[in-house]
Structures are given as structure tokens and as C-alpha cells.
Swiss-Prot record:
It comes from Homo sapiens. This is Transmembrane protein 205. It is found in: Membrane. Belongs to the TMEM205 family. The lineage of its organism: Eukaryota, Metazoa, Chordata, Craniata, Vertebrata. InterPro entries: TMEM205 (IPR042623), TMEM205-like (IPR025423).
Length: 189
């Protein structure tokens, strides 16, 4: 086999490993760990853990998307891209853009909004309970109804959190479609 062929095989393997690793991480963080931690930890502890994990998670997602985009862009003649190749480049660029928005803009604002929210909750003796463990009227709902500042802080947090979640789902979908396309190109197992 030619030396260039070996290098081409290595590049393909790196591309597949980085893409599948990123997608696996995204699936775990998005659909497993967050739900498990939310149901198992006190509310403010959950927030603290997420505030430490998410910056790394978003930056790793951003780095993986950048590596895959660079690999793919360098391996194709731009004038002769097939529909699938152009789609894959677009999906990886979308993933890079969404991960960058999350890492550099949304995550810091979401975390800052969470800390502001938790400050008010701590003043009221809230945040130490595991979600779903409280009996009786919801103290957070009562606080929202009585304290307009808290209600505004909560809206701000959920605005950033919602945008961050949409960006994250966009990354998961983009990488998943890239993996599906690669799987469809496999000739045999």
C-alpha cells in the first residue's frame, strides 16, 4: 500500500474517532447524566456540578467540531463536492458554530444567571433539597409569585438555558446526521 494511502486511512480513522467520541459525549451529557444528577443531587449542588462540567463539555464539543471540519475540508476538492460532502461540511460548520456560541457566550451567561437565582434562593433557605422530595406547596412557585426580582431572574436564567439547550440539540443532531451518513457509506461489516 502507498504511504499516502496509509495517511488517508489514518485521517479517516481520526475523523471517525473524533466524530463518534464527540457524539457519544453529547448523548451522555444531554440525555443521561443531566437527568440522573438532577434527580439525585440537591438543587444547588446540581447547579454547581453543571457549572463545572459545561464549560469543558462545550469547549470539547467545539474542539471536536473544529478538528472534524478541518479534516473534511482538507480532504475534498471544493469544486467537485458531492451533495453529501457539502452537507457534511455544512453540518460540521453548524456544529462548530453552535458549540462556539454555547462555549463562549451562552454558558457564561447561563451560569451567571444561575448564581444570581441561587443567591435569592439561599436567602430564603431554598436549594438544599433534592427535586421532587418536597411535600406540600411548591416553595419556588410561592417565591416567584411573591418576589418580582426572583421571577425576573428566573426568566433570565431559563431564556439562556433554553437557548443553550437548543444549540446543544443542534450539535447532537448535526453530529448524529454526519455519523449516519458515514454509516450508510460502509460497504460491509
Amino acid at each position: 500500500m502507498e504511504e499516502g494511502g496509509n495517511l488517508g486511512g489514518l485521517i479517516k480513522m481520526v475523523h471517525l474517532l473524533v466524530l463518534s467520541g464527540a457524539w457519544g459525549m453529547q448523548m451522555w451529557v444531554t440525555f443521561v447524566s443531566g437527568f440522573l444528577l438532577f434527580r439525585s443531587l440537591p438543587r444547588h449542588t446540581f447547579g454547581l456540578v453543571q457549572s463545572k462540567l459545561f464549560p469543558f463539555y462545550f469547549h470539547i464539543s467545539m474542539g471536536c467540531a473544529f478538528i472534524n471540519l478541518c479534516i473534511l475540508a482538507s480532504q475534498h476538492a471544493w469544486a467537485q463536492l458531492t451533495f453529501w460532502e457539502a452537507s457534511q461540511l455544512y453540518l460540521l460548520f453548524l456544529s462548530l458554530t453552535l458549540a462556539t456560541v454555547n462555549a463562549r457566550w451562552l454558558e457564561p451567561r447561563t451560569t451567571a444567571a444561575m448564581w444570581a437565582l441561587q443567591t435569592v434562593e439561599k436567602e430564603r433557605g431554598l436549594g438544599g433539597e433534592v427535586p421532587g422530595s418536597h411535600q406540600g406547596p411548591d416553595p419556588y412557585r410561592q417565591l416567584r409569585e411573591k418576589d418580582p426580582k426572583y421571577s425576573a431572574l428566573r426568566q433570565n436564567f431559563f431564556r439562556y438555558h433554553g437557548l443553550s439547550s437548543l444549540c446543544n440539540l443542534g450539535c447532537v443532531l448535526s453530529n448524529g446526521l454526519c455519523l449516519a451518513g458515514l454509516a450508510l457509506e460502509i460497504r460491509s461489516l
